[in-house]
């Protein structure tokens, strides 16, 4: 497992699918980004709806561009909101069923892109979300700092060498009767 950038274009279809299909969809995203061959055939797979297939086609070209870039910026960062999906989150996801995994990924997406904290719920998805929350908050803080302009720019005009500021002549003022 290696970290990858989670774009809001992945979250959009996930939040529209029911939890079980969202979990399956996200597993396919992870498999695809790990270099595995992913094929979708709605006609022969009863689990996959035409809606599921269309959602996959809507992001497949962006997934391919990201995979070919080997994790480096491929222009998607400038077009879409995003955050790093750490191996820690992926590991938590692998422990969950498709249904719980879908709930988990939806919680993360809602928290990161919509600022919606999940309400207390039964099940492992909520527990795992709470375990991941501290790291998500760190990513959120970096996103907010980046929105403000990120790291401060270096000064383009460095101080000139050999330039000494002139001192005012206090002795001359005292001779003229000005004591202020």
Q: In which residue ranges do the predicted regions lie?
A:
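Append "and, occasionally, other polyanion-binding protein interfaces
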Residues: 1-21, 76-111, 153, 160, ...
């Amino acid at each position: 497992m290696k970290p990858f950038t989670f774009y809001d274009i992945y979250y959009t279809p996930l939040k529209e699918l029911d939890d079980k299909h969202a979990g399956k969809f996200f597993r396919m995203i992870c498999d695809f980004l790990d270099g595995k061959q992913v094929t979708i055939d709605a006609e022969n797979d009863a689990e996959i709806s035409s809606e599921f297939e269309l959602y996959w086609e809507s992001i497949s070209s962006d997934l391919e561009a990201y995979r070919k870039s080997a994790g480096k910026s491929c222009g998607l960062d400038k077009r879409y909101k995003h955050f790093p999906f750490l191996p820690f989150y992926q590991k938590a996801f692998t422990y969950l069923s498709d249904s719980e995994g879908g709930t988990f990924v939806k919680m993360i997406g809602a928290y990161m892109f919509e600022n919606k904290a999940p309400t207390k719920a039964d099940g492992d998805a909520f527990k795992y979300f709470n375990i991941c929350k501290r790291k998500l908050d760190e990513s959120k803080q970096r996103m907010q700092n980046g929105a403000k302009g990120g790291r401060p720019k270096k000064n383009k005009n460095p101080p000139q060498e050999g330039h000494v500021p002139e001192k005012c002549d206090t002795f001359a003022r005292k001779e003229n009767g000005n004591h202020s």
